[in-house]
Swiss-Prot record:
The gene is MADS2. Residues 1-61 form the MADS-box domain. GO terms for molecular function: DNA-binding transcription factor activity, RNA polymerase II-specific; protein dimerization activity; RNA polymerase II cis-regulatory region sequence-specific DNA binding. It is found in: Nucleus. Probable transcription factor involved in the development of floral organs. B-class protein required for normal development of lodicules (whorl 2). Residues 84-170 form the K-box domain. This is MADS-box transcription factor 2.
Amino acid sequence: MGRGKIEIKRIENSTNRQVTFSKRRSGILKKAREISVLCDAEVGVVIFSSAGKLYDYCSPKTSLSRILEKYQTNSGKILWDEKHKSLSAEIDRIKKENDNMQIELRHLKGEDLNSLQPKELIMIEEALDNGIVNVNDKLMDHWERHVRTDKMLEDENKLLAFKLHQQDIALSGSMRDLELGYHPDRDFAAQMPITFRVQPSHPNLQENN
């Protein structure tokens, strides 16, 4: 007798359900890789667990977005709403703007000029002239700041040299006074009034007994 059909239904036990999900998920992703390699097929698989965790696989030579675009083109089903269309249009606009900027940059470098009209060449020339003026202005500002900085350093060096010179003069004066036997206490005694000077000890100056 043949095996009877087993009814496919939700597994109630959460532990058994998780184990089965893990095994079946691994099997599906393995089969997706095999058919992609063996048959050179474009395969994209997206799996969400009951907890919302994402598992996916995509053929190495493509991407899920490209596969979805091909699916939308071939099936005629619309996968993207207006919001996504608007976002896609904005991305295309930015890409186009970037391409135009790259072309303009090549023109400013003197590349790919043969296809340009005289009017376009004149506009490039004006842009280059304006750029030269701006560069010269920046260089002048830098030079002026450099001059001011040098002047400040020069003034500071002069002030420092003056202070060092003054200190040398003061030090030289002190050394000269020491060499000549100058003693500040003697000068102080000489400047005192006579009445306050200490008289030398002399027998004639002592009181008679």
